[in-house]
């Protein structure tokens, strides 16, 4: 009995131990499973993070590669454009060289033909003289001694007359050489005593920025700021990869100066929006007008020319913003005034008259875009309008031989103008031709009815026309653009194509009280 009870107890103990062991194993297994599941989840999360990082890295690398390709493409495009421009310049230079050679050959042909004609004439004269001598000898053989003596004296008289004519010609030639030598001495002395600085003008101006973020503010939302500034000033704003700088491009130096001053004021002020831009452009325009007056007064003071009419002084100041073949017209006028005065002093002429006429000789260039006719005649009319003396008026009008000169001072002004212009490096013809083409383009646009103002931009590849909204409706802008296209094609020679951009803007302004 005791044995059976012990066995039963052992069985129960074993059973309990088995259950405990089973539960323990089950708990351990469950804990391991949970640990493995948690570890698997962590591995999965890490894998997702790694995948996301790899994805971002790949996207970043792709963007960098795209940016690099885009920069390479832009660089290659710029290089190709530069190469095309260089080739165009070479073609133009070759064409000019061929034209010059063609003209030279034509002149040589004319010279050869003239020489051949002269040779034929000489041969004819020789033959005629031969026949005359032969006839004369035949006649003399039948004359008496007295008749022969008379003929001999007549021949001697003719020979002496011929020798006297040669002597007179030689004296005249020596006198002319002496006069030329004296003239060269006068001009050389004047040039040696006159030293003037010249700076060839360009069509661009670089405005420094405090940082590159300012470029975005200048452009404005959807480009409204840059459009407003370009429309109000007629100047191209070039914003490229140049760090902390924007470029102002315009063939008209006055517009470029107004745009520069307005932009610099806006940068300092910090408030850049269309209304503020209009205010600054208006203020800059007034500042430029004030500067023009100061430049005119300074030129008159520098050359000691006094008693000028205020409007003449203003026109003189405007010449600072005009160039002729790359030469600043105001500095050119000052140099001509100096040269004319110095030559007048050497020759004992009226120095004051020569300097005054020299300073004012190109005054017509200050308004010749607004009036028809040669600038010399326009300048003469202006001088007459503002009560200059008749000799000054004549010297101005005659410096390109448009009218007859009435004084020696007028001759000196013409000579001084030629000396200043002919100095090596003083002028560049290609820039002047380019500027004249842009001026002609604006002149064609302004000649149409309803046009308020026009600006040639993009180096002459685009003309922007602002029309009067009360005279031209929306349909009229299309018709105006077509008429302008026809006029430009008929009246202007240009490379490539020109974009005609007609803008009609209507504003309604009222005030709430």
From Swiss-Prot:
Which key words tag this protein in UniProt? Cell membrane, Endonuclease, Hydrolase, Membrane, Nuclease, RNA-binding, Transmembrane, Transmembrane helix
Name of a matching Pfam family = HD
Any one GO BP annotation for this protein = mRNA catabolic process
Question: What EC number(s) does its UniProt record assign?
Answer: 3.1.-.-
Domain named KH: which ranges?
Answer: 203-288
Q: Where is the HD domain?
A: 329-422
State the function annotated in the UniProt record.
Endoribonuclease that initiates mRNA decay.
Quote the protein name from its UniProt record.
Ribonuclease Y
Say which species the protein is native to.
Clostridium beijerinckii (strain ATCC 51743 / NCIMB 8052) (Clostridium acetobutylicum)
Gene assigned in the entry: rny
